[in-house]
Amino acid sequence: MARLVGLAMMALLVAAPARAQIDPRGALLERTGWDAITAGQGAAAAKAFREALAADPKNARLHLGAGLAATLERRDEDAKDEFERALVLDAKLTRARALLGEVLYRLGDLSEAIRTYETLTADSPEDRDAQATLERWRREADLHDRMQRAIGSHFTVSFEGPAEAELAAQALESLDRAYWRIGPLLGVYPSDPIPVVLYTSEQFRDITRSPSWAAGAYDGTIRVPMRGALDKGTELDRVLAHEFTHALIRTLASRNVPTWLNEGLATALETGDLDWAQQQIREAGAAAPLRALQSGFGRFTGDQAKVAYATSAIVVRRMLDEAGGVAVANLLRDLGEGADFNSAFLHRMQRSFEEFW
Ligand SMILES: [Zn+2]
């Protein structure tokens, strides 16, 4: 028996290099693809895996790589297709199943995401993170099942009980005001109703896992913790306008948008008044360097976040003042289509970014 195992091992050891000899180019492409994933370079990874798959279309690992590349580029539908393909070829590729669940969740298909994680946790009972994610999603599904909905022409607002019905009606009115204020400014009018969910603070932290300073979140659904917003109508307007702007930005560009531009536009269009932002930067001594504001702000402490939002808002306010909302919207469209930031900026703002800021 030991000998047989030994022989089987030998066969495996021999098989790997033999395969590489048959297709060294494929092995090299795959290596390039994984290196690009590690470096966060979605486009380069997508290209490498696409070429590798052309020669070896039934390789589950290559489909996993192609899916990860698509995830990095925020092409969630493509990522879903690739992870599903990987799992058809190799049902035990648990990494693909974990990523498929995440992408389904991002696409708003909570029930399918839950089903995927039920299979994942049955296959890998030792995976505590997957178990915790599954439980969180189940709590979200239970909560959403319990919720009622207020339907407007551009938004649907979900809320938990009759006590929140009045607030939901106020939220709908506030969202409609934001729609007719910000839509014309950017020249964007989403046709499909945007889902909005009102949470308690605890539900909000649990479901979005946002930092404690966050007043709202947008991930395809506008999610807002209502406590506190209740007593102050202006705060409700501010938070909903901010998250609605994120929804507009998503319709213009689902990817490639630097965080300072995304958050800056949402913050600049909250109320229009940016005196607080100037004040914030004066107090901090300096604006935040934009290169530190390219990706998510979730890692910042409350004070760092304030300067990050203030800086972003002031930069985007200047863009709006100089070139107008439609030019900023066109810049976002170009970025979403994969354009290089500096060239797109020069084209739409009529001067180089370096000269601008
Ligand atoms: Zn935001």
What are these regions (language model features)?
Residues R146-P258, L269-A277, E283-A308, S312, ...:
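Juxtacatalytic substrate-recognition/specificity segment
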Residues Q21-T38, A43, E51, K58-N59, ...:
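Beta/coil-rich, acidic/histidine-enriched accessory regions frequently appended to metallopeptidases
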Residues T38-A39, L72-E73, R106, E140:
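Register position in tetratricopeptide repeats
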Residues N59, L93, D127-R128:
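Residue-level recognition of tetratricopeptide repeat
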